[in-house]
């Protein structure tokens, strides 16, 4: 029951006074169908008391969509009467978002018997964008289910601002550190290396649009809740959105020349990388290829070996006009780009320039050893 209570009620972040924000997602009441109201309310308040101390001030946020599982009015009245003095006294504000007709009737009936002081703390909001005016989303981490429903209310949380600098189009050469979207995406994937189809499967377009908008506007993102496939889609989007691709046309042309040169491939490739890729691009390549290497170490579970990964994520690293030809399955063993990608996955640790500050962002899989020097 504790796990379900954590999905129903949790600390979502902090308000402008740095006090805790308790988030309640009433849609998740459906997890408690087998419990009667009295026991549910008792366990819920026990759970809340673990989240906040009796002398702590806090803000409450209720997401009330699809909240018709129980007799909502009866449940609301029992919850109000079961609320202890400290919870009642210390709540600073109660925001109710995405209300349906049943929750509106229930809450308005409840407030008719509540004290005027308590009633004044309630505020009804239509959408997450309205909530953002009172509690910035940079302070809140909300679950996917809330954002999914909000898309039925508004097409976007933030107004379009073409003049704003997007996290996804900032030149790599100007980065002082990897963007949060990449770092957190890699962390989520590294925790789920056994998931089948990493970088091959795609998440829903709705989920991808949501996480892009949140990262692009400096919000907290519970990316782990969206899942590893969404994290992979986000990473691919980031690389596709770079002003200059990770691997330039010059680099791709050089792959063919160096492959046919008769010189030792490792030596030839290293010279090409040093000549064609700036330091930040090499550090970025080192990050992503370290993750791809980790994925290959679980290929029996995730069905993604170096060859599959090269075919699935390779197009995101280049904007070449002939990318389809570059990624062709025909004569794959002689395909310079595919051959390079597979080689880079296996030898990332020695191939690309490293820097301690950037290497600290590489997610660590303790079950693996670093690849050996070729």
UniProtKB/Swiss-Prot annotation:
GO biological process entries: intermembrane phospholipid transfer; small GTPase-mediated signal transduction
Site (Arginine finger) residue list: 200
Pfam families: CRAL_TRIO_2 (PF13716), RhoGAP (PF00620)
Sample GO molecular function, one term: phospholipid transfer activity
Keywords linked to the UniProt accession: Golgi apparatus, GTPase activation
Domain of life: Eukaryota
InterPro entries for this protein: CRAL-TRIO_dom, CRAL-TRIO_dom_sf, Rho_GTPase_activation_prot, RhoGAP_dom
GO cellular component: cell cortex; cell division site; cytoplasm; Golgi apparatus
Chief site of localization: Golgi
Entries under SMART domains matching the protein: RhoGAP
PANTHER family referenced in this protein's UniProt entry, alphabetically: RHO GTPASE-ACTIVATING PROTEIN 68F
Name of the protein this chain belongs to: Putative Rho GTPase-activating protein C1565.02c
The organism of origin for this protein: Schizosaccharomyces pombe (strain 972 / ATCC 24843) (Fission yeast)
Lineage: Eukaryota, Fungi, Dikarya, Ascomycota, Taphrinomycotina
